[in-house]
Amino acid sequence: MRVLYLLSMNRTLYSLVGYLLLPIMVLRLLIKGLKTPAYRQRIFERLGFISKIPVPIIWVHCVSVGEFRAATVLIDQLIKSYPDHRLLVTTTTPTGSQAVLEHYQSEVLHLYFPFDLPWVVNRYIKQINPAICL
């Protein structure tokens, strides 16, 4: 019981710090966007403001371009194995986004991974309603 309480407190503290840092995280993306516009162009995706996806989704998250390249074999197999699903690949950087879009064009969907805050993640998951998450 005490362990559950401590885990709950840790998540609460983590979320509180996240909420306090959110303006700084957004400002950082806006500043980075001065040099690389892609950082600011889709900032609302990171806040969970995305359109509802009405088809079954398989969600694959790749932090880096290297992870994406390593995952292409898996993604290709998922496309073949689940023809009635759309694949959503999320990344955290514009270079990751560019790699996904160049490799798959419109064959898969791409979004930026959301900020790790409860209301953001809940909204994001509600909008994509994934059947499978990897």
Regions found by a protein language model. Give the residues of each.
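Active-site and donor-binding regions of nucleotide-sugar-utilizing enzymes
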Residues: 26-134
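Short hydrophobic helices that act as membrane-entry/anchoring signals
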Residues: 5-33
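N-terminal amphipathic/basic-hydrophobic helices that include classical n-h-c signal peptides
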Residues: 1-8, 116
